[in-house]
Amino acid sequence: MPKGRQKVPHLDAHLGLPICLWLELAIFFLVPQVMGLSEAGGLDILGTGGLSWAVHLDSLEGERKEESLTQQADAVAQAAGLVNAGRIGELQGHYLFVQPTGHRQAMEVEAMRQQAEAVLARHEAVRWHSEQTLLKRAKRSIHFNDPKYPQQWHLNNRRSPGRDINVTGVWERNVTGRGVTVVVVDDGVEHTVQDIAPNYSPEGSYDLNSNDPDPMPHPDEENGNHHGTRCAGEIAAVPNNSFCAVGVAYGSRIAGIRVLDGPLTDSMEAVAFNKHYQINDIYSCSWGPDDDGKTVDGPHQLGKAALQHGVMAGRQGFGSIFVVASGNGGQHNDNCNYDGYANSIYTVTIGAVDEEGRMPFYAEECASMLAVTFSGGDKMLRSIVTTDWDLQKGTGCTEGHTGTSAAAPLAAGMIALMLQVRPCLTWRDVQHIIVFTAIQYEDHHADWLTNEAGFSHSHQHGFGLLNAWRLVNAAKIWTSVPYLASYVSPMLKENKAVPRSPHSLEVLWNVSRTDLEMSGLKTLEHVAVTVSITHPRRGSLELKLFCPSGMMSLIGAPRSMDSDPNGFNAWTFSTVRCWGERARGVYRLVIRDVGDEPLQMGILQQWQLTLYGSMWSPVDIKDRQSLLESAMSGKYLHDGFTLPCPPGLKIPEEDGYTITPNTLKTLVLVGCFSVFWTIYYMLEVCLSQRNKASTHGCRKGCCPWAPRRQNSKDAGTALESMPLCSSKDLDGVDSEHGDCTTASSFLAPELDCPPHQPPDLLQGKSGQIC
């Protein structure tokens, strides 16, 4: 045996191990108890089991020192047969009395409880006491019985945590879109599906194709009129009904405007954008011009006016929120800046990424894209699970919704969550919050650039991925941005040739401080460029805009399928890549021809620059960024914290009317009848005047002119002094009448009394027949 180590007498190996274990257990229980009796730290251990009472000693705050209160607490606890475990947190005069340790029978424990209650109830130093019981608390989490909810990876991605819209934490705080109405402008909404029916808003719905209030989709040969119903389910599908799936804003109301299932006119589009705009808060539009890589189109005159009117007067003056899809023409090399809905300053343009955060094959790029959210990708990746129609081949649920058509409704639902916590967000507030909170992420296809204001943007993903948690927390403390300021340059006549690559045409325009003084514009939001260019092949043109900071925007990307020979006629491109930068400085428009064919050179005829922004300074933007980041912990996201909202404007609902073919036919018939009646009336008046010019008389008979008429003329007698017409009554007695009425006076009362004929024409005539 090694020196220094001796065997303890009578301690065999088979007894040593149990004894050591008993010693360790004794130390484990006794040491915390001793520590707990001397300080409040023991509260955590002794207060979790056995009998315990919270006791408030009768002493006013600040009147007695903590030492004396502790001594008094020890004495009261001892009198009750308990042990003072220390002060409860930071509550002065509040102590926890616990049952002394030791195993006791049930009857003994009950006797101790009664004794303690009796002592504490009658002790003069005890103001209040309460026996502590175990409270049932659970970590807040969301559980739905909807069978397809586990497959809704875009809401809660369990396979790849973090690759979702981060909405469950918002739901746990009871933010579900309550009080907000989202309308899906599409091919109809089957509102009788059980996932939609409880949240359906008939007040915000309409069918512009059939001109009735019910937007129910109509079956078609291609079984394709389920698009609007799927979008509606993404937004507001009802949870916990044991059917299909859950919507992003499942507490919101959902409406439908059926407009895409038939011929569409500019007037119908205008009506759709403003239909029930005091009821509907958000307009979700998953449609646009053809995504064929060769179309340049957008809202026409009435549609543009309706968008502008919506953001000015909709939602009691806070502005309707228009969410549009960026388009699915990626496989055709299309670009969403050729889509007038996607590059409008009045819309929120949303693109798509797949489950892995990559840009799908169908997604379009553009400088006007605001943000992206999740959708389906290729066949190996999961698509969006949502409600479906149950007409024709539909089952009421689908796992195959995809495209930017699926991304835009998710964004609309997240905006509904924002409006619940801050109903007075303006349409520009929503855009700003998206810019401030979108998350940049790595994608080898993305060309991320950080602008002068610190915002990162890519043509593929806008300012980044929408995050519901960040959006809602930012909305909770958001105060409105200043009024919209704008600057429009004069129409700049150029008439310069566009050279072929690698050469380029560069034109400049300097925006000075004086130019911006009247509007107060300091920092940018949207920048628009309107160009007129002739070119034999429009798709060969490439247009880039450089802001004063040097931030480049590819506003007009080349398109291989666009062979239109007419060029651009006053087409407006836009960019948001200069958001937050200073407005003053030199703007450069660079145009080049990247085509390979030896065609005639294009001509830049004219262009115009339009700046949109506010009087915010760069410092104001930095301060707002810091404020929002401080709110991302969720500390403001509770009902107790609410910023005051200004009252909205009282704007009456103005029902629009669509010119349907039957209505147009009716108007044509009424118009033709009106023209016929007008011609008849004019002929009647002309004939009446001609008859009066040849005849003059009175209603009751002959009207011989008195001989003194000539004398009156010679004497200069006034017109009103001329004698009245005379006629003979039934007795043959001459009488004068002051009422000269003709048969035509009923049609032309202003011609009742024709002018008197000259006396020389009356010579030789004894009278005229009426």
From Swiss-Prot:
It is an enzyme of class 3 (hydrolase). Inhibited by zinc and copper. Residues 152-472 form the Peptidase S8 domain. Its EC number is 3.4.21.-. GO terms for biological process: protein processing. This is Proprotein convertase subtilisin/kexin type 7. Serine endoprotease that processes various proproteins by cleavage at paired basic amino acids, recognizing the RXXX[KR]R consensus motif. Likely functions in the constitutive secretory pathway. Its main location: Golgi. Residues 480-617 form the P/Homo B domain. Widely expressed. Expressed in brain, lung, muscle, heart, liver, kidney, spleen and thymus. Its cofactor is Ca(2+). Residues 195-228 are annotated as: Disordered. Residues 215-225 have a biased composition (Basic and acidic residues). It is found in: Golgi apparatus, trans-Golgi network membrane. CDD domains: Peptidases_S8_Protein_convertases_Kexins_Furin-like. Residues 141-666 are extracellular. It comes from Mus musculus (Mouse). Belongs to the peptidase S8 family. Pfam families: P_proprotein, Peptidase_S8, S8_pro-domain. Residues 1-36 form the signal peptide. InterPro entries: Galactose-bd-like_sf, Kexin/furin, P_dom, Peptidase_S8/S53_dom, Peptidase_S8/S53_dom_sf, Peptidase_S8_His-AS, Peptidase_S8_Ser-AS, Peptidase_S8_subtilisin-rel. Residues 37-140 form a propeptide. The active site is at residues 186, 227, 405. Residues 688-770 are cytoplasmic.
